[in-house]
UniProtKB/Swiss-Prot annotation:
This is Large ribosomal subunit protein eL42. One of its GO terms (cellular component) is ribonucleoprotein complex. Residues 28-43 have a biased composition (Basic and acidic residues). Keywords: Cytoplasm, Ribonucleoprotein, Ribosomal protein. Residues 23-53 are annotated as: Disordered. Coiled coil: none annotated. It is found in: Cytoplasm. Belongs to the eukaryotic ribosomal protein eL42 family. The lineage of its organism: Eukaryota, Sar, Alveolata, Ciliophora, Intramacronucleata. GO terms for biological process: translation. It comes from Tetrahymena thermophila (strain SB210). GO terms for molecular function: structural constituent of ribosome.
Amino acid sequence: MVQVPKTRKTYCKKCNSHTNHKVSQYKKSKESTHAQGRRRYDMKQSGFGGQTKPIFRKKAKTTKKVALKFDCTTCKTKRVIPIKRCKTIVFMDITQIKKAKVNKKDPNW
């Protein structure tokens, strides 16, 4: 489990300074039906003949690389930065993360 702060002060190229950024997880958008590859695949699939391309079934990885989306609060510029592989990601306030670190050091925790 990875704990990530909801806001982070980091460099913004457009503002040319360190500003506050809102951090969220990047989600894949809906695929376009007008893309050339999608149109080609749909034409190939139509009509008689069944499945034309192999369906991939050998899954090697158990996790995906998480991508974080940074939104600048002043100029609204967005950028996406990947981090390491992890099963779960939790967005917390900085104070909650600091409390969690202090509690881990406590032997009674």
